[in-house]
Amino acid sequence: MAETTNPYQGGPGTGISLPPYFKPTKYVKNNNFFYPGLEEIGPDEMRISFVGSCPWPPRRNQAGTSIMVELGNGDLFFFDLGNGSVHNIIAMGVPPALINDIFITHLHADHYADLPYMLPFTAMAGRYKPLRVTGPSGRTPRLGTQAMVNKMREMLCWHLEEFDNLPVGDGFEVNVTEFDFREENGICYERNGVTVRHWPRSHGKDGASAYRLDWNGLSFVWTGDGRPDELTVKYSQGVDVFVTEMQNDLAQLMSMKSGFPPPLYNYIIDTHHTPHFAAGYLFKEINPRIGMATHMEYEPALDAEVIAGIRTHWDGLFVFGAPDVQVVNVTKDAVWTREAVLPELGNASRLTPAQVLKAAELDEIPDVFEFPPVNFPREEQRIEYLREIEIDPSKYTPKDVQRDLVLEMPPVRFNVRQMMAAQQKMQDES
């Protein structure tokens, strides 16, 4: 029997691929599952959640690709925002108003399809400041992130105008940071001790990029889609968490499962994607503390074969970033992975007073916070006849619960300090 050596020099009971730092961080409350709302992130911790992991077709347990990165300084980032990912983000306990700072790798719809869906609703839910979106240019202006956002707002014209009879402030505005897709290791975000860099990827068409986030001695790379390339190896050196997209190079088997003709399946991989053998090669060349793969049709029956392909190059720590929602906690001395336990209903979490300030981009706690005024009143958006044909509510509402209708948006204000004191009292009594 061949002798197997743990690359991390582990002893008995450590396995053949697990490092000594593969252990719960000191902030982890449950070693087996992540329960949203029951575990605060540590001040020196990074938490990465795969809130979407699938390209096509979408599955009940795999939304379109999106990776949520939380930092111990309170910052929150989203790398891609694929179809259905907002459902998981809300189920993870993130108030809708805090879904911001979105970094798009490229403009295939499975990487940003939830952007038009969430724009008006998160503004209505308290995000009264502009949405911040970062992404690559295209070969021509009409193919870049800014052009996509412009056309998206045109597409949403009816929705945005109708919702303007609600207090949304500047929430419908989108501040786009579009960088030159050709730029190598350029900085597209630098704030609050966080730096995000980017570099180009080979993915069928010009305008695809990878990202690297660095903060407090911790780092994360998301390759986005693309062929395995030398720039990714170069700019991912020293990273803690390296996440590559991956497609199973198993055309015959995938054809049986999904109906793709093998030549078409192979062509898509060979011109657009990273096969599982190449994922292992990238891990070996980069040597991250943990290598992960997502943006894949997760087939449990093929796990062993895919891992075997990865192991032809990489004998270190590897975990799938699929299905939804895999959670990774990272500190300088520990890396730990779990699956999130999410509620079926996924009701949106209420903003705490501190989160209200964050969403409103306020530095100090005001005595009173007031909702922004309505920009386009309801009565200016409908012809009088349609209002007149509404059925009188007294005909369908039981008498004991009838109330005066609110037909004009009233001013809404609340005392932030009183709210904070009341919440603290509830916590003290619980």
Language-model regions, residue ranges each:
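Binuclear metal-dependent hydrolase catalytic cores
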Residues: A2-V221, A304-A334, T352, E370, ...
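Protein-protein interaction and targeting regions used for scaffolding, dimerization, and localization
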Residues: K358-D363
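A polyampholytic, Gly/Pro-enriched intrinsically disordered region
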Residues: W336-L351
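A short, polar/proline- and glycine-enriched secondary-structure boundary/capping micro-motif
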Residues: N88-M92, L231-Y235, A348
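Generic secondary-structure boundary signal with a strong preference for alpha-helix termini
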Residues: G64, V94, S236-Q237, L345
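Cap/insert and terminal regions of metallo-dependent hydrolase folds
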Residues: A210, N216-S219, R227-V325, M419-M420, ...
